[in-house]
């Protein structure tokens, strides 16, 4: 049975995968999304795909099926990281499908997640990892995102863009001192690329939260959670809490 199509369903997705024909994929993907009346933003690059889109539940399900199993990508997105949530209203004004040099910009050619990444840790195992005294817990997001919410004991790199993460790592992280690093981000893409960067620099034990904060908030009960605050999202919902609940907009206006 299909979902209630009166609800707006949101899909956040990414995968690092070799897409040498990414330029040729732009128009077919745009046309497919437009035909389903989807809105949002999709990035295509030689290293993969990254995006967040919204629409009717049936349309989102058709989109997800095409990416993972359809002919457009020919099975190359068979390990797609995909997270679903809902919105009270359409959180995007239009559809954008753009070509990029990177699907998340770090600016380090040696950081290639299609070749090597850190160890994935699912939401259920995350609490134990970050509670260990010899684990450095590292938030890879921008400072304004960290200010809205983060995990207990996490280090804030104080960066304004993800491209500055490599400078933070060069100045503040030492493979000899920081033997175990656990990183996280909104949906998993930034910390996955950051893990590739640290491995290329000689860090041996690097972990990252599979599915990111959003998957953690979806799966871990609030009573067991080590997350504090809200998770910023790059759409009109602004921020999500435990259970992926939208921020109370009326309460926000009253502040």
Curated annotation (Swiss-Prot):
What Gene3D superfamilies does the record tag this protein with? 3.30.70.100, Rhodanese-like domain
Q: Which GO terms describe its molecular function?
A: oxidoreductase activity, acting on paired donors, with incorporation or reduction of molecular oxygen
Q: CDD domains, per this entry?
A: RHOD_YceA
Provide the alphabetized UniProt keywords: Oxidoreductase, tRNA processing
Q: Which InterPro entries match?
A: Rhodanese-like_dom (IPR001763), Rhodanese-like_dom_sf (IPR036873), TrhO (IPR020936), TRHO_N (IPR040503)
Q: Which GO BP annotation is one of this protein's? A: tRNA modification
Q: Cite the active-site annotation.
A: 185
Q: Where is the Rhodanese domain?
A: 131-225
**SMART domains reported in the protein's UniProt record:** RHOD (SM00450)
Q: What is its EC number?
A: 1.14.-.-
What is catalysed by this protein? uridine(34) in tRNA + AH2 + O2 = 5-hydroxyuridine(34) in tRNA + A + H2O
Transmembrane stretches in the record are none
List the PANTHER family.
RHODANESE-LIKE DOMAIN-CONTAINING PROTEIN 7-RELATED, THIOSULFATE SULFURTRANSFERASE/RHODANESE-LIKE DOMAIN-CONTAINING PROTEIN 2
Q: What task does this protein carry out?
A: Catalyzes oxygen-dependent 5-hydroxyuridine (ho5U) modification at position 34 in tRNAs.
Question: Which family, according to UniProt?
Answer: Belongs to the TrhO family.
Protein name (database record)? tRNA uridine(34) hydroxylase
């Amino acid at each position: 049975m299909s979902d209630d199509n009166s609800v707006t369903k949101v899909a956040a997705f990414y995968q690092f995968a070799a897409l040498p024909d990414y330029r040729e994929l732009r128009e077919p993907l745009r046309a497919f999304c437009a035909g389903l009346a989807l809105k949002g933003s999709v990035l295509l690059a030689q290293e993969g795909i990254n995006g967040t889109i919204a629409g009717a539940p049936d349309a989102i399900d058709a989109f997800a099926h095409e990416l993972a199993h359809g002919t457009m990508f020919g099975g190359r997105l068979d390990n797609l990281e995909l997270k679903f949530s809902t919105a009270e209203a359409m959180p995007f004004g239009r559809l954008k499908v753009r070509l990029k040099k990177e699907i998340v910009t770090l600016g380090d050619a040696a950081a290639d997640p299609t070749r090597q990444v850190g160890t994935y840790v699912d939401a259920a195992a995350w609490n134990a990892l970050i509670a260990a005294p010899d684990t450095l817990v590292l938030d890879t997001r921008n400072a304004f995102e960290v200010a809205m919410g983060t995990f207990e004991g996490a280090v804030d790199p104080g960066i304004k863009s993800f491209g500055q993460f490599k400078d933070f790592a060069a100045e503040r992280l030492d493979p000899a001192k920081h033997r175990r690093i656990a990183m996280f981000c909104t949906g998993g893409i930034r910390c996955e690329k950051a893990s590739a960067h640290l491995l290329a620099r000689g860090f041996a034990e690097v972990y990252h939260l599979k599915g990111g904060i959003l998957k953690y908030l979806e799966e871990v009960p609030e009573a067991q959670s080590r997350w504090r605050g809200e998770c910023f999202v790059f759409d009109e919902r602004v921020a999500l809490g435990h259970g992926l609940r939208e921020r109370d907009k009326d309460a926000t206006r009253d502040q």
